[in-house]
Amino acid sequence: MPERFLGIDTSNYRTSAAIYNAETGEWVNRGGLLTVPEGAIGLRQSDALFQHTVRLHEKIEALPQGEVRAIGVSTRPRAVEGSYMPCFLAGESVARSAAHLLSVPLFTVSHQQGHIAAAALSAGKLDLLDGEFLAWHLSGGTTELLLVTPDGKTVRVEKLGGTSDISAGQLIDR
């Protein structure tokens, strides 16, 4: 079986699906921003969930076809107790169903863990994930300094500091 992996993320402002080929190091990402109504300052979770439900199949169908070895999906904003947003249910539902039908492992991660892995991948430094390092995470309502340590097939994230006001992460997402 080829070393291809499917990743899915349905955060509050973007629907994303990607294929990563571990043999070649190549990846194909099909993502798109959700529509925020003119004059609005954000999206309600119900509206984000609806848009993901309508768009996710289009993102997946735009990926190159072929077998996948496993599926990864973001299921919550952060890997901490009580971290929850309904918009992640769209991606989780599709990923769980696909993993079951294809008889492949499903890896659930937080959106934050996905950002960290995506940054390492896009920098060509996946080996960073094999050791401890510091990372700045700017996303949505957060600007945080994190201690990242390997944890099996994913990473453990400890918040060392961050902002308590409107963050730079909002500027990036909006």
Where are these regions (language model features)?
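Short acidic/glycine-rich loops and adjacent helix/strand connectors
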Residues: 1-174
